[in-house]
Amino acid sequence: MMSRNIPGLIPEGGVIGKLPFDGQWLTERSPTRRVPSHGTHLFATTYAFDFVAVDDDGLTAPARSMRALFAPEPPELFHAFGRPLYSPVAGTVVSVHDGEPDHVARRSVLTRIPYGLSQPQRIRQGLPAIPGNHIIIQVAEGPHCVGLVHLQRGSVQVSPGDRVSAGDQIGRCGNSGNSTQPHLHIQAMDSPDLRTAKGVPLRFEEFRQRSPQQGAPWALRRQSCPEQGAVVAQP
């Protein structure tokens, strides 16, 4: 179910970028429903989005079996895993981290219980255990940065100091860090230091959006935030 934009929930300003992927992706979390979108301001996630790739039937992976209810699944099973990701902005790469493993995926509530109980342990492990493999880009025109996290191990294609254009491939979607299934977490912030940065709004220049129901019509959106629960794609 799609959320409705709540007037005044997301302030003006921030960053305007391009969707960083091809194909159809479900907006799992968005600041259109609540701020902070992830329930916390920690690590500059105030206005962050979570996107997960879906097929024409709206599934993130092939239809689940009984095994998926009781056991984790390989991340390679999911449509998002390994999908190319592109820089949403022109700018300079200021920070990268690679080498964190891609975890098994957990679709059911039952399989997520032990993962949730281990959350404090991951936080104590330090910053890499939360975003996993990630890239942070300083926006060329402005003081802000954009971070893409939970990338696939070994997929990061840029290094600090590299200049990128919007649309350049920079990595692939993975399941590293604090992630239960392959997805892209993307956010804008006022500095590249995830420990001290504050989140700022992120909007996308132009994209198509529809409700998740099969056959739902597409609507063109400009300089706005994808709604939580909506499927989005390039224009």
Language-model regions: role of each:
Residues 107-116, 183-194:
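Short, compositionally biased
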Residues 71, 95-152:
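Zn2+-dependent peptidoglycan hydrolase active-site motif and core
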Residues 57, 98-101, 170-180:
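Short, charged beta-turn/beta-strand-edge "cap" motif at the junction between a beta-strand
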Residues 1-99, 211-235:
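Polar/charged, compositionally biased leader and regulatory segments
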Residues 79-81, 130-131, 156-157:
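Short, small/polar residue-rich loop motifs at catalytic or cofactor-binding pockets
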Residues 91, 161-173:
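A structural signal for short beta-strand/turn segments enriched in small hydrophobics and glycine
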Residues 36-38, 125-127, 156, 162-165, ...:
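Acidic, glycine-rich catalytic/binding loops that coordinate metals and/or anionic ligands
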